Design a protein with these regions (language model features):
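Short, solvent-exposed aromatic-acidic interface loops
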Residues: 50-53, 105
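Extreme N-terminal tail/first-helix region
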Residues: 1-17
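Short, structured patches in soluble enzyme cores that scaffold and shape functional sites
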Residues: 27, 68-70, 136-139
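Charged, gly/pro-rich active-site loop segments
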Residues: 75-147
Length: 147
């Protein structure tokens, strides 16, 4: 197997093609990684969630990493790493951006069901707070493995 760096264009093409990645955040020197659905746009990634550990971590330490990949087998894959800064789109000045994020994310079937359904199963509160946020990309790189 050979591993090579890929172009910025190839990284962006992967992020436009897939909708699930792994979001890494950290608090008190403890990393935390979770799968997330996302929508890519040049310069940023939009994500929807409910309140929980990842949101609390990112509110205190906004530096995050998103990893996304396409794996055919152990020697044929493409992986992209995005590092950036968390920006919550909850304040009134972000209303247009939040609506834009929602439109992008709505393109994916059932984009909102999983986090809400899971949270509602564990509580009687049907008014679970949802959070739209953006990762402003600081850096992006990718690797491809070929047989």
């Amino acid at each position: 197997m050979r591993t090579i760096a890929v172009s910025q264009q190839e990284c962006e093409e992967l992020l436009q093609r897939i909708t699930v990645g792994r979001l890494a955040c950290s608090l008190d020197n403890q990393p935390y990684v979770v799968p997330v659905g996302f929508s890519y746009e040049p310069g940023c990634v939009y994500i929807f969630s409910t309140l929980g550990k990842k949101i609390e971590c990112m509110r205190q330490n906004p530096k995050v990493c998103l990893q996304a990949d396409e794996i055919r087998n152990e020697s044929d894959w493409l992986s992209v790493i995005v590092t950036g800064t968390y920006l919550e789109l909850g304040e009134p000045q972000y209303t247009e951006q939040r609506q834009h994020a929602r439109k992008l994310l709505e393109r994916h079937n059932n984009w909102w069901l999983n986090p809400l359904a899971e949270r509602r199963e564990r509580t009687d509160d049907v008014s679970i707070k949802t959070v739209f946020f953006r990762i402003d990309i600081d850096a992006m790189s990718g690797l491809r493995a070929t047989p």
